[in-house]
Structures are given as C-alpha cells and as structure tokens.
C-alpha cells in the first residue's frame, strides 16, 4: 500500500516547517530546557494563533480546525525535526482527546477554547506508582465536595505536569 500526502497537507507541512525553523533554533531549545515550564508560553500561543496547532484535531463546533491525526502527525514530525519545546503532545493531543471523548458538552465548551488558544496548558495524569496500567492498580481517590471533586493520590510520568494550569 502506498500513501502520499495531499497537496494541502504538503503545503501545511511547509508552513509548519518554516515556523519551526524560524522559531526554534538549537540555542533557544537549550535555553528553554533550563526554564521552569520548559517552553516559551508566548511562542506557544503564537503557534496556536498563527497555525492553529492546539486545535488541529478538535472539531470546528468547539473552535478547532477539524483536521485528523494525519495533520497532527505532520506537526509532530516537524516539531521533532526542530525540537520545538512545547506542550503539544501532553496538552493539545492527549488532554484535548480525553476531553473530547469523555467530557460532557459543558466541559468541552468550558475547557477546549482556552486549550486551543494556547492560553491554558493541561496534562493527563494516568500512570500509577505501581506501574500497573489496569483499573485494579488505581490508587487515586476522588471525593465529591459540592460542585468540586477533590483528588487525592499520586501519579507518575505526568507529561507537562510542571507547566499545567
């Protein structure tokens, strides 16, 4: 089976590649690796504004572009090529996907716009200290407190957890 990208996807790749090349020189990557967040929030918001990176796979009904995971993969490939420091995988792909698939309509309307705009960084915490991946090993507890839910426990390997809002 042979696969090739459409002309539109190749044009998108070229735009993303140019942005990454211009905005992510190796000296900047090294500098950002020593910062608290590990990425430049202003540059992240610019990538969301100019290229719509954070909302690529989010349906248009929620403010996204409505593209698929092929376009997400194009961005990931170009980010890997340039080593752009960003919360793309943790916030824009993992967290938004969980919200899209498990969130209520109210949660989607409330949470997705700021994630898509790059104003908010989210993370997904699912790995248990035990290393088990099934529901039997979950040690986290949730307690309803009025309208809020209080979470208690520990998670490991939380991608972008240090920068999440």
Q: What is each model feature region?
A:
Residues 87-106:
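N-terminal glycine-rich flavin-associated loop
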Residues 65, 106-165:
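Glycine-rich, Trp-frequent "lid" loop and neighboring beta-strands that shape
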Residues 13, 20, 80, 99-102, ...:
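Generic helix-packing signal
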Residues 1-89, 110, 114:
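Amphipathic, small/basic residue-rich leader segments at the start of a protein or domain
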Residues 19-23, 98, 122-123:
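Short alpha-helical functional segments enriched in proximate histidine and acidic residues
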Residues 4, 57, 94, 125, ...:
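Conserved beta-strand segments that form the floor/walls of ligand-binding pockets within enzyme
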């Amino acid at each position: 089976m042979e696969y090739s990208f459409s002309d539109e996807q190749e044009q998108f790749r070229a735009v993303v590649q140019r942005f990454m090349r211009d905005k992510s020189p190796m000296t900047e990557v090294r500098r950002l690796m020593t910062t608290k967040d590990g990425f430049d929030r202003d540059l992240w918001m610019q990538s969301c504004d100019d290229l719509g990176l954070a909302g690529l796979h989010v349906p248009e009904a929620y403010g996204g572009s409505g593209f698929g995971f092929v376009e997400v993969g194009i961005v990931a490939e170009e980010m890997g090529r340039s080593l752009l420091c960003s919360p793309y995988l943790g916030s824009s792909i993992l967290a938004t996907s969980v919200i899209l698939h498990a969130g209520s309509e109210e949660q989607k309307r409330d949470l997705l716009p700021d994630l898509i705009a790059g104003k908010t960084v989210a993370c997904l915490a699912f790995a248990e200290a035990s290393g088990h991946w099934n529901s039997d090993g979950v040690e986290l507890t949730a307690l309803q407190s009025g309208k809020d839910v209080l979470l208690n426990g520990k998670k490991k390997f939380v991608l972008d957890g240090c920068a999440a809002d």
